[in-house]
From Swiss-Prot:
PANTHER family: NERVE GROWTH FACTOR NGF -RELATED, NEUROTROPHIN-3. Residues 1-3 form the signal peptide. It comes from Candoia carinata. This is Neurotrophin-3. One of its GO terms (biological process) is nerve development.
């Protein structure tokens, strides 16, 4: 499998879907050969595994599994995320962060922060907030409702 278009960052959702469809149709997901579809007398479809002779014939024609990905692994990791890959059952609502470089890079960081609003990167206040200076507060309630002790003094550096 060549990844030239993926390296260039121009992989579209349609091309990724067609690639996955091709892998599934080729039976590569579970490292199995494709199944034949046969019709029974009542018109119902049934799947039949290929025989060893058919498997040898396909191997001689150049069919070889390229990738072996267990479907159970994909079921467990439905939301695997990396800068280049997002496996999900749902179509993405917006483009990946790598391609959101429409703004010029020279803009002022402060104005960008004001325009985008406040970002929370997993950092939330542990204690209840006060709008005035508090000097004698020794305990507080954290966001889970537990009573916590407030440190009066924090020493940093070598002690």
């Amino acid at each position: 499998i060549q990844s030239t278009s993926m390296d260039q960052g121009i992989l579209t959702e349609d091309s990724m879907n067609s690639f996955i469809r091709t892998l599934i149709q080729a039976g590569i997901w579970k490292n199995k050969l494709p199944k034949q579809t046969a019709r029974t007398k009542d018109g119902m479809q049934t799947t039949v595994k290929r025989t060893e002779a058919e498997a040898d014939a396909m191997a001689s024609k150049g069919f070889q599994p390229i990738v072996s990905v267990d479907a159970e692994l994909l079921r467990q990791q439905r939301r695997f995320s990396s800068p280049r890959v997002l496996l999900s059952e749902n179509a993405p609502l917006e483009p990946p962060p790598l391609y959101l470089t429409e703004e010029p890079l020279v803009q002022n960081r402060t104005s960008r922060r004001k325009r985008e609003g406040k970002r929370h990167r997993g950092e939330y206040s542990v204690c209840d907030s006060e709008s005035r200076w508090v000097t004698d507060k020794s305990s507080a309630v954290d966001i889970r409702g537990h009573q916590v002790t407030v440190l009066g003094e924090i020493r940093m550096g070598p002690s």
